[in-house]
Curated annotation (Swiss-Prot):
GO CC terms, sorted: external side of plasma membrane
One Pfam family it belongs to: LRRNT_2
Alphabetical UniProt keywords: Glycoprotein, Leucine-rich repeat, Receptor, Repeat, Signal
Quaternary structure annotation from Swiss-Prot or TrEMBL: Interacts with WAK17 isoform 1; the interaction is direct.
Function: Contributes to activation of the hypersensitive response, a form of programmed cell death, upon fungal infection. May sense the presence of fungal material and relay the signal to WAK17 isoform 1.
Signal peptide segment: 1-24
Glycan attachment sites: N66, N104, N113, N150, N161, N215
Protein name: Disease resistance protein BAK6
């Protein structure tokens, strides 16, 4: 009986090892496919070799102890091209740092599947189209920075579900519609920058109340098409409201 149990334990250990290896290879396959979709004039992705056992030895990639990818650091790397929907299958990814490049096309809705994601930095690119509502399902997200792109459409009300968020920076896009009152649910929010868009309507009281009941220290909604009245006496917030009537 002991021998049978020992053999069973060995089989289980082997299966777990194979599962971990398969996961690593999956991450590598995804990233290599993304590499092929990008232009890389500076050869920063030269080390992304699909023949290796896993991507953990690649430059600009960080893995956890299980050899799963948790971080991709390609800020200001000179790359261009689209973001593939396959990126949403990087199950352990915590940091996606792709700012300051020439990425184009839309933000894949599949990024909402990255349930461990802490930071999504896609600022200063050439991204177009709407912001996926699915990003509002990433409860672990603390930094969402999509500013200085060409994004259009509304701010997803689903962002009100991001109750761990510290920074929401969507400025210098072409976003339209109203500011969702649901953003007032994010009591952890410290920085909210929505300036230089095409937002309309009034600033919801739920959002303004974050100054009192939350941790908001910077609110920038300048250079939109907002209207209404804002009163801010004794508030801790730096409110830059150039295009609003202030009573």
């Amino acid at each position: 009986m002991a021998a049978v149990q020992f053999a069973a334990a060995g089989v289980l250990t082997g299966l777990l090892a194979l599962a971990t290896l398969a996961s690593c290879n999956t991450d590598g396959d995804i990233l290599y496919k993304q590499r092929l979709a990008w232009e890389d004039p500076n050869n920063v992705l030269q080390s992304w070799d699909p023949t290796l056992a896993n991507p953990c030895t690649w430059f600009h990639v960080t893995c956890n102890l299980n050899n799963s990818v948790i971080r991709v650091d390609l800020g200001k790397a000179g790359i261009s091209g689209p973001l593939l929907p396959d990126l949403g299958a990087l199950e352990s990814l915590q940091y996606m740092e792709l700012f300051g490049n020439s990425l184009n096309g839309s933000i894949p809705s599949t990024l909402g599947n990255l349930t461990d994601l802490i930071s999504l930095d896609l600022w200063d690119n050439l991204l177009t189209g709407p912001i996926p509502t699915t990003l509002g399902s990433i409860s672990t997200l603390r930094y969402l920075r999509l500013y200085e792109n060409n994004l259009t459409g509304p701010i997803p009300p689903s962002f009100g579900n991001l109750t761990s968020l510290l920074e929401l920076k969507l400025h210098r896009n072409s976003l339209s519609g109203s500011i969702p009152a649901s953003l007032g649910n994010i009591k952890s929010l410290q920085f909210l920058k929505l300036n230089e868009n095409m937002l309309t309507g009034t600033v919801p009281l739920e959002v303004l109340s974050l100054v009192v009941v939350g941790n908001l220290t910077e609110l920038n909604i300048a250079r939109n098409n907002l209207d209404g009245t804002v009163r801010s006496s004794g508030l801790r917030v730096t409110a830059v409201i150039q295009d609003m009537r202030i009573a």
